[in-house]
Swiss-Prot record:
Belongs to the bacterial ribosomal protein bL25 family. CTC subfamily. Keywords: Ribonucleoprotein, Ribosomal protein, RNA-binding, rRNA-binding. Gene3D superfamilies: Ribosomal protein L25, beta domain, Ribosomal Protein L25, Chain P. The lineage of its organism: Bacteria, Pseudomonadati, Pseudomonadota, Betaproteobacteria, Burkholderiales. Signal peptide: none annotated. HAMAP family: Ribosomal_bL25_CTC (MF_01334). This is Large ribosomal subunit protein bL25. Pfam families: Ribosomal_L25p, Ribosomal_TL5_C. GO terms for biological process: translation.
Length: 203
């Protein structure tokens, strides 16, 4: 995904306010060299930020005709206006592993027998996960297959099938948090149990 930005020479609260009033958003690029102050078209940035891939993909940032690979690292929003106050990008080194969070996409939830027949309600405890990998291996998202999770079970971080070249960060491996749970609500009864209860008693 390509992002076009322009060099920014002025900084400070007053300069940033004037920039935003002119339809621009201030930002910075850091890492692997000198920090670079930039400005971006606010409307284009606002629409880009609505895309999931913008937050979890390697971006091609063009500044003054020169391109560099970056990751979006931070966005500051106005508390009640549709306004981006500031955006941070980090340069990416193709030979160095990066740590970042990627979204989880949950698959086959609707067809899961625990939901259809077992009365379970699948709960997403975590919707993104922190990984480490080389930039070339960075996935836009990671799929979590819920087809086989059973009623009353939980799926943990280390249960997720990761793409080649991708690993969980060390603290997630150690903590192994719950990603998804499939509890049966109190008082709920599975279709199978209900069917058993409806059978006439043997004479």
């Amino acid at each position: 995904m390509k992002v076009v930005a322009f060099e920014r020479n002025l900084q400070g609260t007053g300069a940033s306010r004037r920039l935003r009033n002119s339809g621009k958003a201030p930002g910075i690029v850091y890492g692997a060299g000198e920090p670079q102050l930039i400005e971006l078209d606010h409307n284009a940035l606002w629409h880009a930020l609505k895309k999931e891939a913008f937050h979890s993909s390697i971006l091609e940032l063009e500044v003054a005709g020169k391109s560099q690979q970056v990751l979006l690292r931070d966005v500051q929003y106005h508390p009640f206006r549709q306004l981006v106050l500031h955006v941070d990008f980090q340069r990416v080194d193709a030979k160095k592993k990066l740590h970042t969070k990627v979204p989880l996409h949950f698959m086959n939830q609707e067809t899961n027998p625990a939901v259809k027949l077992g009365g379970a309600i699948i709960s997403h405890v975590i919707n993104e996960i922190e990984i480490e990998c080389l930039p070339a291996a960075l996935p836009e998202f990671i799929e979590v297959d819920l087809a086989k999770i059973e009623a009353g079970q939980s799926l943990h971080a280390t249960d997720i099938a990761l793409p080649a070249g991708v690993a969980l960060v060390a603290h997630l491996v150690a903590e192994n948090p719950v990603i998804v749970s499939a509890p049966i609500p109190a008082g709920a009864q599975s279709e199978e149990a209900a069917a058993e209860g409806e059978k006439p008693a043997a004479e």
